[in-house]
Regions:
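A contiguous, well-structured pocket-lining segment that forms one wall/lid of small-molecule binding clefts
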Residues: 1-75, 88-99
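Membrane-interface transmembrane-helix boundary segments in multi-pass integral membrane proteins
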Residues: 50, 78, 108-111
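Glycine-centered flexibility sites
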Residues: 4, 10, 82-84, 130, ...
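Short active-site-adjacent structural elements
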Residues: 87-90, 111-113
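Short, mixed-charge aromatic SLiMs
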Residues: 11-18, 86-88, 139-154
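Glycine-rich beta-strand-to-loop/alpha-helix junction loops that act as flexible
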Residues: 76-86, 117
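Non-transmembrane, aqueous-exposed alpha-helical and coiled segments at domain scale
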Residues: 52, 64-71, 94, 104, ...
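Glycine-rich phosphate-binding/hydrolytic loop that grips phosphoryl groups
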Residues: 58, 106-153
Length: 154
């Protein structure tokens, strides 16, 4: 959805949005983690493409906003990485919902297209060295935990 044009032309299906947001995940304090399969996106399949995109965009921005009570203090600025940072409609929704500036990470000189790859490279090095990838304070794991499997192409 280039620049969020499709979502911007749709209407949020509030009933569907409420169903998506009706998850104990949002009321659970960190540490916690989430799987992409946790939500039933089939709820939007009966919607038009425009309304489905608008509803999922609203879900994204509202779900991020619902995390705010779990922060020690409200951020004064949000930096966004990943493909969503190119979606003007999503970025505007986030700014409206959060009530502060929401900018792509390029605003501070970071490469938003490389950041995820850099993070995975860091995790790969941690894994190869047998160092922790997760800690109790970040995901609720019982202790610092490494992970991953190394496969050689030779």
């Amino acid at each position: 959805d280039r620049d969020g044009q499709i979502a911007a032309s749709g209407e949020v299906a509030n009933g569907v949005l409420d169903q998506l947001l009706d998850s104990p995940y949002f009321d659970t304090a960190p540490p916690k983690s989430l799987d992409r399969n946790q939500f039933d996106v089939s709820l939007v399949q009966s919607l038009s493409m425009e309304d489905g995109a608008a509803t999922l965009t609203a879900f994204t921005s509202v779900s991020i906003t619902r995390a705010l009570p779990h922060f020690p203090e409200k951020p004064l600025r949000w930096l966004v990485t990943g493909g969503g940072r190119h979606n003007k409609f999503l970025m505007a929704n986030l700014s409206r919902e959060l009530g502060v500036d929401v900018e792509p990470v390029e605003a501070v000189g970071w490469n938003g297209d490389a950041l995820e790859a850099q993070a995975f490279a860091y995790l790969a090095v941690q894994s190869r060295k047998g160092l922790p990838l997760t800690y109790p304070g970040t995901t609720g794991a019982k202790g610092p935990t490494t992970g991953g499997v190394y496969f050689s192409s030779s």
